[in-house]
C-alpha cells in the first residue's frame, strides 16, 4: 500500500506531466524510415463525401489514442512511477513502452529510446521528440510488413516488422 508521501509524489508527477501535454511538435518531420503525419495531411485531409461530410482519416486519427499515445498524461505518470520503482529495469521499460507509445522513435533508436529525463524522447530538445510525440502515426502503420504474425497474438505489443523501402502500404 502507498504511504501518503507516495500518493503526493505521484499526484505531483501526474500534474507535471499533464501540464506538459500541450508541447507542440513538428508533425512535418522526416527521419530515416518515417515521415510525420503533417506530411500525409496535405493530401489526406479535407476529404468530403457526396453529402459534404468530412471523411478525412487525418481528422479521425488526430483525436485517436494512436495519435496521442505519447501525450497521455496517465501513461507518462505510470512510466515515471515504474521507472522509479524499478530503476534496474529502466532499459526494458523504456523499450517495451516506446514500442507502442512512441514506435517511430523506438524504431529509429533501435529500441534504445529513453522516455523521460534529459535524454528522453519526451524532451523537446531530443532529436526524436517529434517522432515520439506523433504517436502511432501514418507511416509507421503503413510500413508494417505483411507477415505471418500480423493480426495474431504474436504480432501484438509492437512485435511487427517495418519495411525499409519507405513504401506506404494500404489499406492498413
For every predicted segment, state its role.
Residues 8-9, 17, 65:
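Intrinsically disordered, low-complexity segments
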Amino acid at each position: 500500500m502507498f504511504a501518503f508521501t507516495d500518493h503526493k509524489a505521484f499526484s505531483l508527477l501526474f500534474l507535471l506531466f499533464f501540464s506538459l501535454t500541450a508541447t507542440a511538435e513538428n508533425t512535418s518531420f522526416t527521419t530515416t524510415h518515417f515521415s510525420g503525419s503533417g506530411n500525409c495531411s496535405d493530401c489526406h485531409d479535407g476529404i468530403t463525401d457526396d453529402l459534404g461530410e468530412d471523411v478525412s482519416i487525418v481528422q479521425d486519427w488526430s483525436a485517436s489514442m494512436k495519435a496521442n499515445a505519447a501525450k497521455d498524461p496517465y501513461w507518462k505518470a505510470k512510466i515515471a512511477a515504474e521507472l522509479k520503482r524499478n530503476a534496474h529495469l529502466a532499459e526494458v521499460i523504456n523499450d517495451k513502452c516506446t514500442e507502442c507509445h512512441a514506435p517511430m522513435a523506438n524504431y529509429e533508436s533501435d529500441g534504445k529510446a529513453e522516455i523521460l529525463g534529459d535524454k528522453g524522447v519526451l524532451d523537446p530538445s531530443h532529436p526524436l521528440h517529434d517522432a515520439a510525440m506523433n504517436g502511432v502515426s501514418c507511416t509507421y502503420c503503413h510500413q508494417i510488413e505483411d507477415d505471418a504474425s500480423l493480426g495474431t497474438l504474436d504480432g501484438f505489443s509492437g512485435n511487427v516488422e517495418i519495411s525499409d523501402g519507405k513504401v506506404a502500404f494500404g489499406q492498413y
